[in-house]
Amino acid sequence: MTSNRGQGGIQQLLAAEQEAQHIVAAARNAKMARLKQAKEEAEREIAEYRAQVEREFQRKLAESVGDSGANVKRLEQETEVKIHHLKAGAEKIQYDVVQMFLKHVTTVKN
């Protein structure tokens, strides 16, 4: 009978060990599932953030390109005005400059 009791005790221990292994395996699987879910959630958040940043970048890029076109037009207008002022100023003093050159070229000095 004692050997029966010993066999029963061993069987109980083996059964308890198997149950413990099942519990550990289930816990490990649950942990892996949680990690996988957390990874997928993090990847989804990263993708959403990346898309948001890309949209913001494209919006700012479009704004700056629009501003660039306006700046080009403004600079062209300012340049035309400055060229006109320079030409007008040159026309005003053109006669005097030509006369001064003629005077210096035709005057003989000893």
From Swiss-Prot:
What Pfam families does its record include?
Answer: V-ATPase_G (PF03179)
> Gene3D superfamilies, from UniProt?
1.20.5.2950
> What Gene Ontology cellular component terms go with this record?
vacuolar proton-transporting V-type ATPase, V1 domain
Q: Which domain of life is it from?
A: Eukaryota
Q: Which UniProt keywords apply?
A: Hydrogen ion transport, Ion transport, Transport
What does the record give as the function of this protein?
Catalytic subunit of the peripheral V1 complex of vacuolar ATPase (V-ATPase). V-ATPase is responsible for acidifying a variety of intracellular compartments in eukaryotic cells.
**The protein's name:** V-type proton ATPase subunit G
Q: Which organism is it from?
A: Citrus limon
The major lineage groups are:
Eukaryota, Viridiplantae, Streptophyta, Embryophyta, Tracheophyta
**This protein's encoding gene:** VATG
